Design a protein with these regions (language model features):
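Conserved RNase H-like, two-metal-ion catalytic cores of nucleic-acid enzymes
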Residues: 2-135
């Protein structure tokens, strides 16, 4: 019975519809969490695609006070935002010089730079580095 209930939850008609976010105003943003989703087929053999020019950004997840959103740019099933619109908005965001939070910041910020979005901010916190220090 429990298995059937769990399977029922997985059926498409029970999944909430994803709503495309709008680009919110970023003026005055103090801190932002950033996570990139990428297609990086040769990461295990050549390293990060941002450094080897292999692969591409698939989407960008952003969270700051009052906003949590995901901006797909190269999903195979569509629903993508125009890449240039996302890049333009990200450039505005980083010009506010927020504290940037990432998990594996070298990777995400490397991809942003390869993608044409410089994240020249004063402070970056990396939870990949911080996590072992907390334990």
């Amino acid at each position: 019975m429990i298995f059937e209930q769990q399977m029922d939850l997985l059926k498409k008609e029970n999944k909430p519809e994803w709503t495309r976010p709008k680009f919110p105003d970023v003026s005055g943003i103090k801190q932002v969490a950033v996570d990139l989703e990428t297609h990086d087929p040769e990461i295990k053999t050549l390293g990060g695609g941002w450094a080897t020019n292999k692969g591409f950004v698939v989407g960008v997840a952003i969270s700051f006070e009052g906003f949590d959103g995901y901006f797909p740019v190269r999903h195979e099933r569509g629903g993508n935002f125009p890449e240039e619109d996302v890049k333009k908005w990200l450039r505005k965001l980083f010009k506010e010089d927020p504290i940037v939070l990432c998990h594996n910041a070298v990777y995400d910020l490397g991809w942003l730079r390869r993608w044409g979005v410089d994240c020249n901010v004063t402070k970056v916190y990396d939870t990949l580095i911080a996590a072992p220090l907390v334990d």
